[in-house]
Amino acid sequence: MKKTKIYLSLILLALLVYYCSTVPITGRKQISLIPASEINALSFQQYGEFLKQSKLSEDKEAVGMVKRVGVNIQKAVESYFSQNNMMNQLQGYEWEFNLVESDEVNAWCMPGGKVVVYTGILPLTKDETGLAVVMGHEIAHAIAQHGAERMSQGLLQQLGGMALSVALQNEPEATRNIFLAAYGVGTTVGVMLPFSRTHESEADRLGLIFMAMAGYNPEAAVDFWTRMSKAGGAKPPEWLSTHPSDETRIADIKKYLPEALGYYKK
């Protein structure tokens, strides 16, 4: 049993070391067990299915704004990566920007550069700069490979559960089940959700820089998230949420602004 525990621990350690990458700008180390090519292929498939089930907006002005902001931020991202000799990280990207008809207040960017904005968020973005806040944030999630990291965390969580199960194999059945249940809750609250909040904060920071490089004033982010805060309903406590609280997010954005403003050219 002891040898098995050591063996599993070594496997997990090897995975963490070998499949470790670095997030641009923040320098945070992240685990990435799944090749970008596989992530992108899955992303493109899901994106195609989503479009088949959705209605694209016919508002030419709004559609034009979404595509314009998207292309501007795309160029900013490519410029940053080119200047830092990191263009290989954008290999396989097939950028696309669409506006879909939906009352949902939402937007997202799938790995590989597939961006969708919902018409329901436009009243809150108000203008092109507000939209750049949202699109910069969502594109930053993809650029930082947060989706791949989340999937990798899920795989590690499964491996960790297997390791604990082996370690407790000599314990009574009831005791083992209790431990495994506790492990599941502990992993979700203690590890998985905090990473989600880290992703959100990281996307805020990168998004501010990308929108600034694209020519949009990053100071508009404070106003946008203030509007989002007022529009939101009851929220769970921050420690059980995948997003930072509104107060935390706005405070963090204010801390990130001096850095982002260094990239801003009117």
Cite the ranges covered by each PLM segment.
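A Zn2+-metalloprotease active-site environment signal
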Residues: K2-L8, L15-K266
